[in-house]
């Protein structure tokens, strides 16, 4: 029999443990971030400018300064800043653009320099760029005339409704007018009688026949005078 001490139990191998890298921890997957809902707030409207247009401010500066050699860009900037109380540095590019365009059009004269630098002045007959205000429309006097015409038309229309009655009156008067017309026809027939009585008066003209008697009396006087003169001449011898 073998001794129990001699029998050595074989060691039991342990299961291999999975080795994990030191310092590295497995990260859990991140949940996707919820998108923030966009707020539908209305955009604020841009504030209206409290100053007039750049063109008006520049022209006003040049006309007010009245410099003989023209107003420079620096002088225009100072005037605009003092008069209108605006941030001139923001308006400088617009002022330069207006000056160049005005010189090209001829609304401004460049006394010195080139481009936006130099001095500028208005031409002698140039007018301000200010837009003329529209005059209020004056009421036209013609509006009173149509009222009178409409009144006259109404007056004319009223007797037009009574025309049928006038026609009846004229129809009734026609037979009476025929009777009256028959009476002057009888008078016309009687009128020729006095004309026939007047004809014999024209035929009586006995005065014209007395003229030949005077002509017969003249030759009777002449032969009686001639024989009396001849014997008187013989006695004178």
From Swiss-Prot:
**Localization per record:** Nucleus; Chromosome
**Compositional bias of type Basic and acidic residues: which residue ranges?**
26-42, 200-209
* Pfam families per UniProt: Linker_histone
Which residues belong to any copy of the H15 domain?
50-124
Q: Which UniProt keywords apply?
A: Chromosome, DNA-binding, Nucleus
Compositional bias ranges of the Low complexity kind = 1-21, 182-195
Q: Which GO terms describe its biological process?
A: chromosome condensation; negative regulation of DNA recombination; nucleosome assembly
Give an example GO cellular component term for this record.
nucleosome
Q: Where is the composition biased (Basic residues)?
A: 210-237
Q: Which SMART domains match?
A: H15
Q: Which InterPro entries does its entry note?
A: H1/H5, Histone_H1/H5_H15, WH-like_DNA-bd_sf, WH_DNA-bd_sf
| One GO MF term attached to the UniProt entry | structural constituent of chromatin
Which interval of the chain is the signal sequence?
A: none
Write out the ranges of the annotated region (Disordered).
Answer: 1-56, 109-237
Q: Which SUPFAM superfamilies does this entry report, sorted A to Z?
A: Winged helix' DNA-binding domain
Organism domain of life: Eukaryota
**Which family does the UniProt entry place this protein in?**
Belongs to the histone H1/H5 family.
Q: Relate the protein's function as given in its record.
A: Histones H1 are necessary for the condensation of nucleosome chains into higher-order structures.
- What name is this protein filed under? Histone H1E
Report the source organism: Chironomus tentans (Midge)
């Amino acid at each position: 029999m073998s001794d129990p001490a001699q029998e050595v139990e074989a060691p039991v191998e342990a299961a291999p443990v999975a080795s994990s890298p030191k310092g590295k921890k497995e990260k859990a997957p991140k949940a996707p971030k919820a998108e923030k809902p966009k707020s539908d707030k209305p955009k604020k409207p841009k504030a209206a400018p409290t100053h007039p247009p750049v063109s008006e401010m520049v022209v006003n500066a040049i006309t007010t300064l009245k410099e003989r050699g023209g107003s420079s860009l620096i002088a225009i900037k100072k005037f605009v800043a003092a008069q209108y109380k605006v941030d001139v540095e923001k308006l400088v590019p617009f002022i330069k653009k207006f000056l160049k365009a005005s010189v090209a059009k001829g609304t401004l004269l460049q006394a010195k320099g080139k481009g936006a630098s130099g001095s500028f002045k208005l031409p002698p007959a140039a007018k301000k760029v200010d837009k003329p205000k529209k005059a209020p429309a004056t009421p036209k006097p013609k509006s009173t005339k149509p009222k009178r015409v409409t009144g006259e038309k109404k007056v004319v229309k009223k007797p037009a409704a009574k025309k049928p009655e006038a026609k009846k009156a004229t129809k009734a008067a026609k037979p009476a007018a025929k009777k009256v017309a028959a009476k002057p026809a009888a008078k016309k027939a009687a009128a020729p009688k006095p004309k026939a009585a007047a004809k014999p008066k024209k035929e009586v003209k006995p005065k014209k026949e007395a003229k030949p008697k005077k002509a017969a009396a003249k030759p009777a006087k002449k032969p009686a005078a001639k024989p009396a003169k001849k014997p008187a001449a013989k006695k004178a011898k």
